[in-house]
Regions:
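Feature targets compositionally biased, intrinsically disordered low-complexity regions
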Residues: 17, 29, 45, 107, ...
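Short secondary-structure boundary/capping segments
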Residues: 17-21, 62-63, 96-100, 127-134
Length: 176
């Protein structure tokens, strides 16, 4: 039902007014045209950004631009936001996600808010009141029971994830 663009859809810098802009080579018609195309196919359009100053791949993050970015997403008719946790400079996770939640609400368009915090700050204790969906680990990797380090972060196999997070099943439910 959703087509979600992950990290790297935007230009390396914001425009002169501080707005996010699409990478003009990857998306020459921009995000609104892409959203219109996806919606015309009967699908919903999702986009990625990050609570930090930069995304995981080094593109502009939303820190300090939450309300401006939320207005952009609404003007592009975005239906879903995956909001990652890279380059967060010791931000308070719950507070950072509340700020974007409030910005999305203020933008006036219903946007599913997916909290991609990796479980480091125990989102199972607060995320259900902040977003529509939340993760509890880092990235899933194509293996059954393994962990692969990537420097400052790791990926896990599904069995390892199940065993790591089995004690939080009581807080799981539809949308979480």
């Amino acid at each position: 039902e959703y087509i979600v663009l992950d990290d790297g859809w935007m230009a390396k810098e914001r425009d002169k007014n501080g707005n996010l802009v699409a990478d003009s080579i990857k998306f020459p018609s921009g995000m609104k045209a892409l959203a219109d195309y996806i919606h015309a196919k009967g699908l919903k359009f999702g986009i990625y950004n990050c609570a930090g100053s930069k995304t995981c791949a080094g593109y502009p993050g939303s820190r300090g631009y939450e309300y401006q970015d939320a207005r952009s997403y609404a003007s592009w008719d975005v239906d879903y936001l995956k909001y990652d946790w890279c380059n967060t400079e010791k931000l308070n996770a719950e507070g950072a996600y509340i700020t974007m939640r409030d910005a999305l609400k203020a933008a006036g368009r219903p946007i599913v808010f997916s909290i991609c915090e990796w479980g480091d700050n125990q989102p199972w204790k607060w995320a259900k009141d902040v977003g529509h969906a939340w993760r509890v680990t880092g990235d899933i990797i194509n293996c059954w029971d393994c962990e692969v380090g990537h420097g400052s972060w790791s990926s896990w196999g599904i069995w390892k994830i199940i065993n790591m997070r089995k004690n939080i099943r009581k807080v799981a439910g539809p949308g979480h």
